């Protein structure tokens, strides 16, 4: 840290605020300029100076300072990855003054992040959260473009939350953020792994590279606790590798193999047994190194149960008592767009979920399949109806995989448009359908193609019986549909609720 602080001191000016967007520079700001994925910040140095920048810190590789820019400046090699430590220094190392939990994994990050923050706040520990649904405090989240902000903005946010009285921060940490150094300079106290499955291969290229990016969080300097899902093979692998590395590994899971691994490695553990689930929620026996108890919640889905075990482990290593953890986790509810349920009772159950990977779609379909209502003989048995598509300009290899999964686990699949972006929706749909029609013997469900997403959702709900579950997967909380560079207003939840009203009107007619 002294290396960067000495360099900043050498500028001869007071650095109080760092900015990476030249358009956002105001008099007295220091401009940080490095190449990004879409533009090179160094091309906007002149604009930053015009807007009142008091100095410029710039990426040294492949660039020369224009001597007509008579302004204090500093060339730094690999600035993008050093920016976090520079920002940490400028903003007074805010993460060192709070309890910081980083959550990574393919699925479950958002729910886990929110449940940790909700539980801490309810217990009197003011907690900020940073993630997909926004940044800030739970009741006043500000929208965000990325799951994890860039390094400069991240440290500014941490400093702001500290000023507002935050004692803790729960933060989603994406693989992109770890790869690009967006969380560099942050002092993490606890790192939580939810799971690892196929995603973002359009960016990382292959699963080993994707896993390596996630793995970085568990090698973090001065990390105190690594909380790992031992039901997940990647979590079990990390647990083995972290032995005698100076960080305490804490496991969690539902499987006997997870418990056996924890016992063999001598780990503290949170383990669940005797799981019972229906459309109204679940009950679970808790066994842990902190004691035992019973957990009830209205959430549905085995994967949500596992996520709650991970959150419980985080709370326990953070000093929360088991009784308080059980109480608070019995009260948490579905995060918007994450197994969010509507209807039920005398209407079909509609579940809106962000599942956009093969593993996530499989897990949510298994979850609703486990709790779909089976009625007495002579009354309609519940079916699972799945509405989904795949995003354009993303990993194309997962499309047929998701089609095959839906065909296997749903009684009816309605293939529709997601966020097609620059691709033709019907081309994406055709790739999904290829997985349904590829001759797999396990394919039992029927399928339809309805390109318009609103029409697909309406058809699914209106055709459902009261005992059916309609799963609308892929977009979750998103309030738009992106087509050819334009984001049109669209909400799966709103469309589903309108369809449920129409279903009720038809049923009463």
Predicted regions mapped to residue ranges:
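Phosphate-binding loop of NTP-binding sites
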Residues: 65, 81-230, 234-247, 309-312, ...
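Active-site beta-alpha connecting loops in nucleotide-dependent enzymes
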Residues: 36-39, 335-337, 367-439, 453, ...
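Receiver (REC) domain switch/active-site residues of two-component response regulators
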Residues: 54, 189, 411
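Short glycine-rich anion-binding loops that position phosphate/pyrophosphate groups of nucleotides
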Residues: 24, 36-38, 175-176, 198-199, ...
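P-loop/Walker A phosphate-binding loop and immediately adjacent motor/lid segment at beta-alpha junctions
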Residues: 47-52, 57, 221-224, 245-249, ...
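Acidic, Mg2+-coordinating active-site environments of NTP-dependent enzymes
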Residues: 62-67, 179, 190-350, 435, ...
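N-terminal leader/targeting and accessory segments in enzymes
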Residues: 1-85, 89, 233, 271-275, ...
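Glycine/aspartate-rich loop-and-adjacent alpha/beta segment that forms the canonical ThDP
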Residues: 469-502
